[in-house]
C-alpha cells in the first residue's frame, strides 16, 4: 500500500475511452453532430476516469483476466491470479498478493492474500463503499463464499460462508457447545 492512487478519483474527469485513447466528453458533445454527419463519431468502449488495466499493463506470467472490463487501471494483480468473467471485478488501489481466484468484487484499496478465493458474487468493500475509509485486507488461504460480503479485515485460513455479511460492527456469538468443539479441534 506504499504506492497508491488515493485522491486521484476526485481529481480526474470522466472521459470517453476508445481503445486506450481518452476523449474529453465536452469536446465530444461540442463536435457530436459534425462527427456523426462525417461518419467519424468514435465507437466508445466506456466512459470512466480510469482506463482498463490491460490497455496499459501486461499482466504477470500465469495471470488470467477473462474480460478486459473487469480490472481497472491502478489495480495490482500478482502472478497466478485469475479474474473470471461475470461478477468478478478489481478496482484501482486494490489487488492480490499472490495467486488468487477472483470471482467476486475487490473494491478500492482492498488487498487479498495469496491462495485465497473470492467466490462468485462475493464483495470486499472498499474505501469508497462502506468502510469509513479503512482499507480491507483479506489474509492468505481464505475463502469468501459466494455472495458473501466483508467490510473488515479477515485473517489467514478463514472461511466466510456463502451469503454471510461481516462488517466492523458485526457481533458474533458462539454457543458453549460450539466453543467446546473449537477448543477440541484447535
What are these model-predicted stretches?
Residues 131-135, 140-143, 149, 165, ...:
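C-terminal segments of enzyme domains that contribute to small-molecule binding surfaces
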Residues 47-54, 62, 68, 74, ...:
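Generic secondary-structure boundary/loop-capping signal
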Residues 63, 69-71, 75-77, 81-90, ...:
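A structural motif detector for beta-strand N-caps
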Residues 55-64, 133-135:
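Short, positively charged
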Residues 24-39, 120-128, 147-152, 156, ...:
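Short, Lys/Arg-enriched charge-dense amphipathic segments
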Residues 2-6, 12, 30-32, 37, ...:
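Proteins with a high burden of low-complexity, intrinsically disordered sequence enriched in S/T/G/P/A and R
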Residues 1-59:
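Terminal amphipathic alpha-helical/low-complexity segments used for targeting or macromolecular assembly
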Amino acid at each position: 500500500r506504499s504506492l497508491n492512487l488515493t485522491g486521484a478519483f476526485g481529481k480526474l474527469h470522466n472521459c470517453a475511452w476508445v481503445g486506450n485513447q481518452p476523449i474529453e466528453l465536452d469536446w465530444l458533445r461540442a463536435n457530436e453532430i459534425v462527427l456523426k454527419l462525417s461518419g467519424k463519431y468514435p465507437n466508445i468502449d466506456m466512459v470512466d476516469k480510469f482506463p482498463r488495466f490491460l490497455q496499459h499493463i501486461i499482466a504477470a506470467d500465469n495471470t488470467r483476466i477473462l474480460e478486459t472490463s473487469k480490472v481497472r487501471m491502478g489495480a495490482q494483480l500478482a502472478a497466478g491470479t485469475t479474474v473470471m468473467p461475470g461478477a468478478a471485478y478489481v478496482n484501482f488501489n486494490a489487488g492480490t498478493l499472490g495467486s488468487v481466484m477472483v470471482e467476486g468484487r475487490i473494491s478500492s484499496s482492498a488487498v487479498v492474500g495469496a491462495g485465497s478465493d473470492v467466490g462468485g458474487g462475493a464483495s470486499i468493500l472498499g474505501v469508497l463503499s462502506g468502510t469509513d475509509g479503512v482499507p480491507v485486507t483479506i489474509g492468505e488461504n481464505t475463502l469468501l463464499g459466494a455472495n458473501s460480503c466483508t467490510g473488515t479485515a479477515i485473517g489467514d485460513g478463514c472461511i466466510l460462508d456463502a451469503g454471510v455479511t461481516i462488517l466492523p460492527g458485526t457481533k458474533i456469538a458462539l454457543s458453549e457447545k460450539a466453543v467446546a468443539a473449537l477448543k477440541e479441534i484447535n
